[in-house]
Curated annotation (Swiss-Prot):
<keyword id="KW-0539">Nucleus</keyword>
<feature type="repeat" description="HEAT 7">
    <location>
        <begin position="1219"/>
        <end position="1257"/>
    </location>
</feature>
<keyword id="KW-0677">Repeat</keyword>
<dbReference type="GO" id="GO:0005667">
    <property type="term" value="C:transcription regulator complex"/>
</dbReference>
<feature type="short sequence motif" description="DEAH box">
    <location>
        <begin position="1440"/>
        <end position="1443"/>
    </location>
</feature>
<dbReference type="GO" id="GO:0006364">
    <property type="term" value="P:rRNA processing"/>
</dbReference>
<dbReference type="InterPro" id="IPR027417">
    <property type="entry name" value="P-loop_NTPase"/>
</dbReference>
<dbReference type="GO" id="GO:0005524">
    <property type="term" value="F:ATP binding"/>
</dbReference>
<dbReference type="InterPro" id="IPR044078">
    <property type="entry name" value="Mot1_ATP-bd"/>
</dbReference>
<feature type="repeat" description="HEAT 8">
    <location>
        <begin position="1526"/>
        <end position="1565"/>
    </location>
</feature>
<keyword id="KW-0378">Hydrolase</keyword>
<dbReference type="InterPro" id="IPR001650">
    <property type="entry name" value="Helicase_C-like"/>
</dbReference>
<feature type="repeat" description="HEAT 3">
    <location>
        <begin position="569"/>
        <end position="606"/>
    </location>
</feature>
<dbReference type="Pfam" id="PF12054">
    <property type="entry name" value="DUF3535"/>
</dbReference>
<dbReference type="GO" id="GO:0045898">
    <property type="term" value="P:regulation of RNA polymerase II transcription preinitiation complex assembly"/>
</dbReference>
<dbReference type="Pfam" id="PF00176">
    <property type="entry name" value="SNF2-rel_dom"/>
</dbReference>
<feature type="region of interest" description="Disordered">
    <location>
        <begin position="241"/>
        <end position="283"/>
    </location>
</feature>
Length: 1891
């Protein structure tokens, strides 16, 4: 299944594809219906809007593929459609025939609206609690029943709703507790998200009487229990909806989980906890539970949760979706808005498709079922109406409030209404009418949210059931009445919905209610007049309604009729009412009024355009000058164009009119200058007019800067307020434009000001083109004067106006010659010395120069007479003359003058003043440079605009260098993208001019420069000679490193910005050329084709690159790179007619991929990726046929690097488009993940991470067109491989070709199949089966088989790559004998050499190593004899207990990783022991680079997981930790195989783990207290220290505490501080330090052994003699320290239990003798006990002769203890294994268990039984497999979620305290306006209803 893709899919396309695939599963497997729905249901509760929407879509598609439920289909009648239902059908008589329906069904006729509003529980965003804690303990079915029962009360239909007290006094009463005996029956636990299993056992008061508690204590207990419930309910649970009823029966589970049975009170563990072997909570008392694990019972058939329960007579007769809809209907009233939203969307989809079957039952007649269906649907309608009334959640994200719940419920109601009979629709309408009117609901005051909800419901009713509106006049009248009431409502959101309600039925209304049109239009126009609040968001909706209505002739006729009666109702009077809203505060309103005006302009008929006059023209043009939103600006220009068309049609430009008086001020405003940051130049506000036509007062133009809050550009809806007055919109409407009018560049931005000038120029160009030519001279005079204006921005605007006019008129215009004469001086002559609008920069430069001179005077004491005098007035000032301060004056001061004055200083003056002089000069130089740059930029802009105008006028001189330079400078340096785009257009026009003329002129040079500029950005086009020496590198990786290391970062960034600007301009010009010339591009501009094609052919024609290509003076290499880069840049704009030309170049690009130079491969890879994205079929065919074979070229690393780099870029360029081809790429890339080249490996790993995400979606994509049959067959083979890799159960059975002397169990055969699969595809993995499942045997099978197959292949082919090679087994010393024995037993035909023992013995064996089949050695020997083992090429390198290489810095780890082998395999039952960083080290051995570098892994996984452990971690840290664990688990999943014993061994008896607590002795307690008092302060000071000595001190203290827990004899020795004191104490007690009385663990050990029958006297009766007596149990006793074993041996066995026969295995036993001791213990039952240290006896040994395991001490590493206990609990064990852990109560040992628990949780989450193959993991989870990061660049960056809080600041800007939670930390993900617009588009909804 792909259900998780609904949540994790990165794009809507992926999520929608996942939804479609789930639907396809339903189509192919109809029996999977309820499983699929159960999987998807939890995603409806997601916090993510996109996830909920995708889940709802998936449900809709699945339900659509399910059979329609019609129990009466055999009757031969179809279910009657609601649309055909007659209003007057009387079905009352039929109803009477039926038995009464369930009382829980609500009826529309009896719905008590006043009670619901009075008593119903309000539905807000969240009730402050995410779960009903009191329901958390119920199973899903019980919870659903309870919620259904209480729903009537929550709706207010049973009086006032009072929340239940979560925990009342009765809950505190002690209940009798039945003591349970240990049992091996455990029920499988399942939960639905938000619920859990029982949380805690009944609370038992200490004194047994609840009456003994005071009221305060009872309240305290309530709070504690409430908190406990909350904690339980909020835990994250694995969602599993696959079973509903199974848990109700006490049966044996199909998969058991570790299950605790309390020995004291039978309390159950939380159902959501991990399989955990340790319990910690000290505050809850001793954990004396028994954990029963690993018992495999018979399977229990499970029914999906959502599947209706079968009855005794057969399948459930009800509608199959009834149970799911019950759950969703309860969720409709959840306190959390996201849950309500998801439920409403899902109900919408189900009802839309399957609503006709709802409520129907098998066995009823058609008539009866029709009634049942109507009643069920009526009930749902009632509930939806209740939500519309009770919901109060609104989102003020946009201009209008969006109520997502009410909107979605409205859509659900719409879907429902399409299924309802007419009678019910009328009932729904009546309820909605009452909700809107609110006249009979008993409300003290109207509630706007209720009215809003009712109006939304009415909107969808109107849209869906137009048929009833047409039939029923009363219904139409009622709707109109409600809408008119809504349009007059005090709340603007209600007005907005009311207007939107009428839009879908506008046509029907106009045709059927012509008599009321006049009234309605009056109301609509009055609604606009009465809008008082400047934030009234409804204005846009009202205008849209108005525009829609005015498209009907009937409405226009009605308006004309109104106008005849009342002149105030004419178009000329009404339309101007819209003008105030042109500059409304809210963007959507400004947009709506423009849409309305556009509609009015397009109307035809007499009198419809009488409102168009000079004032209208002026107001629209003012929009262009002050509008900051680009979308509204474009609309304004469209309205302007339509306005000019209307005026031209009327002939307004032909005669002298009042237009001229309006146009001149507009020209003045258009050419007005604007300033620079900090020095604004305001517009002349007196030239603006108000909507009334009066001039705009300049005093109101600019808002005060001191109160920015009053000038927010977009209004934000805040408190609703009702205005009693009805006046015209206030004159402050222009406040939205205050900053534009003031010219406030700091707030508005220079780009926005420039854009307004550009649009104004376009508008004036259009106006001048249509204006009567005879009236133009006066206008042109004003414009041409602007070309000589003192401000650069005025000159720019004038030139742009001329250009826009010329584009329309061409060179033939009457004024062309005049315009050209005025423009040429700008291009050819000198520019003015300075511009007035940038004079401020010169003032700053002068001030800094003056400061420099003052510094000479004050610090260097230079006489004033020697200092130059600076003019006060600067150039650009209005009164500036020829002697004003200029830029050259400034340059003289900081240059010659500075040097002259410095030379005149005495040595003493230099010493004291030189530093400050240099600093002041640097400041002045910076100011001068800034002034110079600004001046050059303004010159460039004016020249470029003038050049563009001359080109548009076709005034191209014979020597066009000045024109070309003007435009090309803009292409190179213009920072403003729109001005640069204009220059690109002008260049295109110039090239077109020359291509149509006889001479080509400078075209080739222009094209050459554009290509050069396009390739100047080294981040896109690398420098050839700079990278020419790189051969075995992948530049895609190197370039990311280069970007980070630059000595002068500021200079680098400045140069990089300049290069980006130049490339952007050149790329724009080339793209415009491609669009302009289309398929003729290469013919019209042959130089472009030559620049791309020639270098490729010249450099790549031969097999080798030209020998001199690296010569510094040779440009061919750079030309190749530039050609590829240029093709990549402009290819997306190519006409399809040019594609064959590109395809002809593909072989050369492929050849470039094989090039030995990294830089050419890089350029070719990026170019090839772009070609594939544009010309997909031909490109991908070439990829599969030519590029992919290169990736396996073992002889040439350049081929592999080129191919993998190409795939890397292809993935990122094509994104979703690569889906049909993804299967071709996975296997080749996978093979390179273990490449010998590090860079190939890294890039392959990164690419594979992205590719595998898409594999689940690939199957549903249709075959790509154009691929050959051969390729399609190849794709099927690749699919088979992927299926095997992702599901171990699909791996082909591997027949072992050699005679293994063992019968493999089925799971062992599966393991060998998996190992053979890895072998076949040269993959490497970890076999991490549970301890005792035969990893050794499986390994022997695959190694022996591979040796045999290689020998056969070599005999047949004599190929050196399959020659005989030895395999190496590396294991702990204890297991070397074990491996020898296993090999001898199972594969005696293999020649095995044990490379162990002392150096002399190993030296003797060295010559035999290359010829052996198997070499067994240890990790230490690998480290010591590295020079012996390294030179040998091994076939297999197997690391047994591979977790021993967990420390990547250990010498043994480094040595092992240097070994060379064909196949690498790790065996480990516990691959993660302490932290996840260990897993990185393991994979660094298997596939270096697969998990990134150690630092990346640490940041991405290890740190978040570790940070989430701390109790003070924030919820975001905890979430980051959980996500990191899950991501890591998925990433390593395909390369680990793990099976648990309880899964695969039916015959393995259970293992019971129990804690055995001992109270510390008096002596121990005394020593503890003394140590704590004396050492605690010192230890606290040293915690966190990085000093080695401090760390050692802490470690020694911990060791002291651990030893003391065991026996005081281990710590109290001579030299101990309390030695004498202890001796005195012992003397007084007549005891000694080794007495078991002082070490309770020893006496506890004795008691345990005796209880087990070990050490008891032999039976005195019967036929057994003492000599022949054998104990019923045999034990393994584990200690950490050999010293403790000595004490156990001497004090317990020798003194207390002398009859016990025992063996001992610790570090003092030679490695070669250890297996003998194991064999003796297993075969000789007379030995009762085996004493072991955990380090020696805890790994790999088979000790099934014992059935009792006792831990006297515990390891910090929990996996070591688990490993040790599983020495007995493994294959071959016939008895129940009891594990006892001796724990000294209240000591450090309990802390150790706490730490163990966390480590086990992490390990079991990352590596668990899902690693049995991806078949056990939903394919939905595959999306985020291998998520190393999107690119190599992001992979190197540390994750933000790593829990690092250093230097973080909180919301107030203060430095955040570590671990402290901010008040916004838990804020959920924000959703955006786009989601609302997409979801609540009425047209889209209606389309789905039809579909």
């Amino acid at each position: 299944m792909t259900s998780r893709l609904l949540e994790t899919g990165s794009t809507p396309f992926i999520r929608n594809t996942a939804a479609q695939q789930l639907a396809d599963v339903q189509k192919q497997h109809p029996d999977e219906l309820f499983n699929l729905l159960g999987r998807i249901l939890p995603y409806l509760r997601s916090k993510s809007w996109d996830t909920r929407a995708a889940a709802a879509k998936a449900i809709g598609l699945i339900v659509a593929n399910a059979d329609t439920f019609d129990p009466n289909q055999d009757d031969g009648q179809e279910i009657k459609k609601a649309e055909n239902d007659d209003l007057d059908v009387d079905i009352k008589s039929e109803e009477e025939l039926l038995s009464p329906m369930d009382d829980s069904l609500l009826q529309l006729e009896r719905l008590d609206l006043p009670s619901i509003l009075k008593y119903g529980k309000r539905l807000l965003g969240s009730a402050g609690k995410e779960y009903e804690y009191s329901l958390a303990a119920m199973d899903p079915a019980s919870r659903l029943q309870h919620q259904k029962k209480t729903l009537t009360s929550r709706l207010g239909l049973a009086g006032e709703y009072i929340e239940e007290d979560l925990i009342n006094d009765n809950d505190l009463v002690s209940k009798p507790v039945v003591k349970e005996e240990p049992s091996f029956v455990a029920s499988r636990e399942h939960s639905i998200q938000g619920t859990s299993q029982p949380l805690a056992s009944p609370i038992e008061p200490a004194n047994g009487e609840e009456s003994g508690l005071s009221k305060r204590q009872l309240n305290q207990l309530k709070r504690k229990n409430k908190q406990s419930a909350r904690m339980g309910a909020n835990k994250v649970r694995v969602v599993d909806l696959s079973s509903r009823r199974a848990s109700e029966n006490v049966t044996t589970p199909s998969v058991a989980t570790p299950y605790p049975i309390k020995s004291e009170n039978g309390e159950e563990r939380n159902g959501d906890s991990k399989p955990d072997y340790f319990s910690l909570d000290r505050s809850a008392g001793d954990d004396e539970s028994k954990i029963v694990s690993e018992f495999k019972g018979a399977s229990v058939p499970e029914n999906p949760l959502l599947q209706p329960e079968s009855t005794e007579e057969g399948p459930n007769p009800n509608w199959p979706f009834e149970l799911m809809c019950d759950i969703l209907m309860v969720d409709l009233f959840d306190p959390n808005w996201e849950i309500r939203h998801g439920a409403a969307m899902a109900l919408r989809e189900v009802i839309r498709i399957q609503g006709a079957g709802a409520g129907r039952v098998q066995g009823k007649s058609r008539a009866e079922n029709d009634i049942l269906n109507r009643k069920w649907l009526d009930d749902l309608a009632c509930r939806l109406l209740c939500v519309l009334m009770l919901d109060r959640f609104g989102d003020y994200i946009s201009d209008n409030v969006v109520a997502p719940i009410r909107e979605t419920v409205g859509q659900t109601l719409g879907a429902l209404l399409s299924q309802l009979p007419s009678r019910s629709v009328i009932s729904v309408y009546k309820c909605l009418y009452r909700i809107i009117m609110q006249t009979d609901l008993g409300l003290e005051r109207p509630i706007w949210e209720v009215c809003h909800g009712g109006m939304i419901g009415l909107r969808y009713l109107v849209a869906v059931r137009k048929d009833l509106l047409i039939k029923d006049s009363k219904l139409m009248d009622g709707v109109l009445e409600a809408v008119m009431k809504g349009l007059g409502d005090y709340d603007d959101d209600v007005r907005a919905v009311s207007a939107a309600t009428l839009v879908p039925i506008a046509e029907e209304f106009v045709k059927t209610r012509q008599s009321t049109l006049g009234t309605l239009m009056t109301i609509v126009w009055d609604c606009l007049s009465n809008l008082q609040d400047d934030l009234s968001a409804s204005t846009g909706s009202v205008m849209d309604l108005l525009a829609k209505l005015c498209t009907f002739q009937e409405v226009l006729d009605a308006m004309k009729a109104n106008a005849a009666v009342n002149p105030e109702s004419s178009f000329g009077k009404l339309v101007p009412r819209l003008y105030p809203f042109l500059r409304h505060t809210i963007t959507s309103v400004r947009s709506a009024v423009l849409r309305a005006l556009m509609t009015f302009l397009q109307l035809e008929g007499e009198g419809t355009d009488e409102w168009v006059d000079g004032k209208t023209v002026r107001l629209i043009f003012q929009n262009l000058l002050v509008e900051r939103n680009e979308g509204v600006l474009k609309q304004s220009l469209q309205v302007w164009s339509e306005l000019l068309n209307s005026l031209e049609t009327r002939g307004s430009f032909k005669s002298e009119s009042d237009l001229l008086s309006h146009i001149k001020p507009l020209i003045t405003l258009s050419m007005g200058p604007f300033g620079v940051p900090r020095y604004p130049v305001p517009m002349d506000a007196s030239l603006f007019i108000k909507p009334s036509g009066l001039p705009f007062p300049s005093s109101a133009a600019a808002p005060a800067r001191s109160s920015p809050a009053s000038n927010t550009p977009e209004g934000t809806k805040g408190r609703r307020r009702k205005s009693e007055k009805k006046e015209a919109p206030p004159p402050s409407a222009h406040n939205v434009d205050g900053h534009m009018l003031q010219g406030d560049i700091d707030l508005v931005g220079a780009d926005t000001m420039l854009r307004s000038k550009i649009y104004a120029a376009r508008a004036l160009g259009q106006l001048l083109f249509v204006w009567d030519q005879n009236q133009l001279p006066s206008l042109w005079q004003s414009i041409l004067e602007g070309l000589n204006h003192s401000a650069s921005t005025s000159q720019l605007a004038s030139a742009m106006i001329v250009e826009e006019y010329a584009k329309l008129s061409g060179p033939s215009g009457r004024y062309a010659s005049t315009l050209c004469e005025n423009l040429r001086p700008i291009i050819e002559g000198e520019r003015p010395p300075w511009y007035s609008d940038i004079a401020c920069y010169l003032h700053v430069a002068r001030a800094q120069c003056h400061s420099l001179l003052n510094t000479f005077r004050d610090h260097a004491h230079v006489p004033g007479s020697r200092l130059p005098v600076l003019a006060v007035i600067v150039q650009g000032d209005p009164e500036a003359g020829p002697n004003a301060f200029s830029l050259s004056d400034a340059e003289k001061v900081i240059g010659p003058d500075f040097e002259r004055l410095k030379k005149g200083l005495t040595p003493a003056q230099r010493i004291t003043a030189l530093q400050v002089l240099n600093d002041t000069r640097a400041t002045a130089e910076s100011a001068v440079n800034e002034a110079r740059n600004v001046r050059e930029q303004r010159d460039l802009r004016v020249r470029a605009a003038a050049a563009g105008a001359l080109v548009a006028l076709s005034d191209i001189p014979k020597k066009p260098s000045h024109i070309i330079k003007g435009m090309m400078d803009s292409i190179k340096k213009e920072e403003n993208a729109e001005l640069q785009q204009r220059s690109a257009t002008a260049i295109t026009s110039l090239v077109e001019y020359y291509t149509t003329s006889a001479k080509r002129g400078p075209v080739d040079k222009v094209i050459g420069n554009l290509v050069k500029y396009c390739c100047v950005d080294t981040s896109e086009t690398p420098e050839f000679h700079h990278n020419a020496m790189l051969e075995k590198s992948i530049l895609s990786l190197r370039k990311e490193e280069d970007r980070r290391d630059h000595p002068d970062a500021a200079k680098f960034e400045r140069e990089a910005k300049e290069a980006r600007i130049m490339r952007r301009g050149a790329k724009e010009a080339l793209e415009q050329l491609a669009v302009k010339f289309g398929s003729e591009l290469m013919a019209k501009v042959p130089n472009l084709a030559s620049l791309i094609e020639r270098p490729l052919k010249e450099a790549l024609a031969a097999d080798e690159l030209p020998a001199n290509i690296r010569d510094p003076e040779n440009e061919l290499g750079q030309e190749v790179v530039d050609g590829l880069s240029t093709l990549r840049a402009i290819l997306p704009k190519f006409h399809s007619g040019l594609y064959p030309w590109v395809v002809d170049l593909l072989p050369l690009v492929v050849k470039a991929l094989q090039c030995k130079l990294s830089v050419i491969r890089y350029a070719a890879a990026k170019c090839f990726a772009t070609i594939c994205s544009v010309i997909t079929v031909e490109g991908m065919t070439m990829l599969v046929e030519k590029v992919l074979p290169m990736i396996n070229d073992a002889l040439d690393v350049h081929h592999r690097q080129g191919a993998v780099e190409c795939i890397y870029h292809l993935i990122h360029v094509m994104e979703d488009g690569i889906l049909p081809y993804v299967i071709f790429l996975v296997v080749p890339v996978l093979g390179r993940m273990s490449d010998s080249d590090n860079e190939v490996r890294l890039l392959a790993t990164t690419s594979f991470a992205t590719l595998v995400k898409l594999v689940p979606l690939e199957a549903g994509i249709p075959d790509p067109p154009g691929l050959s049959e051969e390729l399609l067959k190849g794709r099927d083979r690749e699919r088979q491989f992927m299926a095997q890799m992702l599901d171990v159960r699909k791996v082909e059975e591997f027949k072992i070709p050699v005679a293994i002397k063992a019968e493999l169990r089925p799971y062992q055969q599966e393991g060998v199949n998996w190992l053979a699969f890895l072998n076949r595809y040269n993959l490497h993995g970890i076999l991490c089966d549970d301890m005792g499942l035969g990893k050794t045997l499986q390994t022997i099978c695959i190694v022996a088989s591979d040796h045999h197959m290689r020998a056969e292949e070599f005999a047949r082919t004599q190929k050196p790559e399959v020659r005989k090679l030895p395999s190496l087994i590396v294991c702990p010393p204890s297991l070397s004998g074990h491996w020898q024995q296993e090999l001898k037993q199972y594969a005696p035909f293999l020649n095995c050499v044990a490379y162990v023992g002392p150096p002399a013995e190993r030296s003797r064996l060295q010559s035999a190593l290359p010829n052996a089949d198997i070499v067994v050695t240890s990790y230490d020997i690998c480290r010591n004899d590295n020079e012996v083992l390294n030179p040998i090429n091994w076939n297999y390198c197997v690391l047994d207990e591979g977790h021993l290489i967990k420390n990547p810095k250990a010498k043994a780890t480094i040595a092992v990783k240097r070994l060379l082998s064909n196949h690498r395999l790790i065996l480990s039952g516990t691959p993660i022991q302490n932290n996840v960083l260990e897993l990185w080290s393991l994979f660094d051995f298997l596939m270096p680079g697969f998990l990134g570098t150690e630092k990346v892994f640490l940041d991405r996984f290890a740190k978040p997981i570790a940070a989430s452990r701390f109790s003070k971690s924030s919820s975001k840290e905890q979430e980051a930790g959980a996500l990191a664990i899950e991501a890591l688990h998925k990433q390593v999943l395909p390369f680990l195989l793990r099976r648990l014993k309880e899964e695969v061994l039916n015959d393995l008896p259970p293992k019971i783990i129990q804690n055995y607590y001992c109270d510390p002795s008096e002596l121990q307690r005394k020593l503890f207290e003394d140590f704590t008092k004396k050492e605690q302060k010192a230890l606290q000071d040293k915690v966190g220290s990085t000093e080695k000595a401090d760390k050692e001190h802490i470690f020694q203290a911990l060791q002291y505490m651990r030893r003391l827990c065991n026996s005081p004899a281990l710590v109290v020795k001579e030299g101990h501080k309390q030695y004498n004191e202890v001796q005195q104490y012992l003397a007084a007690k007549h005891s000694n330090i080794r007495d078991v009385a002082h070490a309770p663990k020893l006496s506890a050990l004795r008691d345990l052994l005796i209880d087990c029958g070990i050490g008891v006297d032999s039976p005195s009766e019967g036929d057994l003699s003492g000599a022949s007596y054998v104990s019923p149990h045999r034990a393994l006793i584990f200690c950490q320290m050999k010293e403790m074993l000595d004490i156990v041996q001497s004090e317990v066995f020798n003194k207390l239990l002398p009859s016990v026969q025992f063996l001992r295995l610790d570090g003092s036993v030679e490695a070669t003798r250890r297996q003998d001791i194991v064999n003796r213990f297993n075969t000789d039952p007379s030995y009762d006990v085996l004493l072991l240290t955990t380090s020696v006896g805890g790994l790999g040994l088979n000790l099934t002769g014992a059935d009792t395991v006792i831990f006297v001490e515990h390891d910090w590493n929990p996996q070591k203890d688990i490993q040790a206990m599983d020495r007995a609990h493994r294959i071959g064990q016939k008895k129940v294994v009891n594990v006892y852990r001796l724990i000294t109560r209240g000591t450090l040992e309990e802390k150790i268990l706490n730490l163990q628990r966390f480590k086990i949780d992490v390990a079991s989450t990352v590596v668990n039984q899902q690693n049995a193959g991806l078949g056990t993991m939903d394919t939905d989870q595959l999306l985020d497999l291998f998520n190393l990061g999107e690119t190599a660049e992001t992979a190197e960056k540390p994750s933000d979620a790593a829990g690092n809080e250093v230097d973080m600041v909180d919301i107030d800007g203060n430095v955040k305290e570590k671990g402290k939670k901010g008040w916004l930390d838990d804020l959920g993900e924000l959703w955006d306006d786009r989601q609302y617009q997409e979801e609540y588009n009425l047209d889209s909804f209606l389309a789905t209803m039809k579909g």
